[in-house]
Structures are given as C-alpha cells and as structure tokens.
Regions:
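A short beta-strand-turn-helix
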Residues: 31-49
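C-terminal motif of bacterial Sec signal peptides marking the signal peptidase cleavage site
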Residues: 11-13
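Sec-dependent N-terminal signal peptides
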Residues: 1-9
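Thiol-based oxidoreductase modules, predominantly thioredoxin-like and allied folds used
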Residues: 31-32, 75-102
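Short active-site neighborhood of thiol/selenol oxidoreductases, capturing the structured segment around
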Residues: 45-59, 119
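Non-catalytic, surface beta->alpha helical segment in thiol-disulfide oxidoreductase systems
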Residues: 68, 106-110, 114-160
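Bacterial signal peptide processing site
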Residues: 15-17
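Typically the conserved alpha-helix immediately C-terminal to a functionally engaged Cys/Sec
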Residues: 62-78
Length: 160
C-alpha cells in the first residue's frame, strides 16, 4: 500500500492545482480535496488525515452524513482538534476540480475502497532528505448513524 500511495503522491505533485481545488464547496467546506494540501496540513499540524470516500451525487448515506453529522458542532470541533479532513469524491457530475478524478481513483484502488461511505485514517510524515511524504494507513471504518458513533469509531485511530 505504501508504494501505491507514494506513486499517487508523485503523480499528484506533477498536476498543477487550480485555484479552487483546495476545498470543496457547500456544506463540507472544511474538507480538502487536493492530497498535496492535505499532506502539507497534516505535517504542519501534526495530525493524521481522515480520508472520506464518497459519491456525493449518488450515495444516500453520504448525503445523510453531510446533514446529520458533518454539519454538527460536535463533529466540527472534534475534527478541528484531531484530524485533517480530506474528501475523495466519485461524483458523476462535472464539479470535481481538475486532476481529482485520477487522484481519487488511484487512492481508492490503493486502499481497496469499493463502497461508500468509507473512512480511512492515514498518518503522514515529510521526509526532508528526499522531499517526499510518507503515508501509513492506520485504520478504516464505514457508515455510523450519529456524530457520537462516528467520532467514537474514528477516535480509535487517533493517538492524541
């Protein structure tokens, strides 16, 4: 998995990002959509990356997460303190930033994600000698119906 993720990062680093590619819009403004941005934020803040795999226009449970969990003060406060939020969206609409489809497909393959919603927690370090990011998968989970249950499941993967 490490080498596949390293290949993703190398490919992503070669893709110029558009001005609007760093975060998603609407109800999930806290979610980054560019892996380079998520890695840099993770290293800077010394927090793991919470990767959220979704298909925002076809996944009913994902829509529920947006309204019932991600928009709650409880989830927002927990996420701000504990993780860097990164969304991998497989929307069929043409609303994804340039390069996102390739990045998202590579990430889903490397982590063997086949259903939505899926959450992966990743640890990221920056290797100064070669300038690359080193990613280590920590754990994963699926849908949980409340902020308390989702946070409880994710908290198992957070060190602090």
């Amino acid at each position: 998995i490490f080498f596949i993720l390293l290949a993703i990062l190398t490919l992503q680093a070669c893709n110029p990002k558009s001005a609007d590619s760093s975060t998603t819009s609407a109800s999930s403004q806290l979610w980054l959509v560019n892996m380079n941005d998520a890695q840099a934020q993770s290293v800077k803040d010394q927090k793991p990356i919470l990767v959220y795999f979704t298909s925002s226009d076809t996944c009913g449970l994902c829509e529920q997460l947006e309204t019932d969990i991600f928009s709650t003060p409880m989830f927002k406060e927990w996420a701000e303190k504990k993780v860097v939020l990164f969304k991998v969206d497989f929307s069929t609409l043409d609303q994804l930033p340039p390069g996102s489809q390739e990045q998202n497909t590579a990430m889903a393959r490397s982590l063997k994600v086949s259903t939505y919603p899926t959450f992966w927690m990743l640890s990221v370090t920056h290797e100064v000698e070669n300038g690359r990011f080193k990613i280590k998968p920590i754990g994963y989970t699926g849908y949980h119906p409340s902020p308390e249950k989702l946070i409880g499941a994710l908290q198992n993967f957070v060190r602090r």
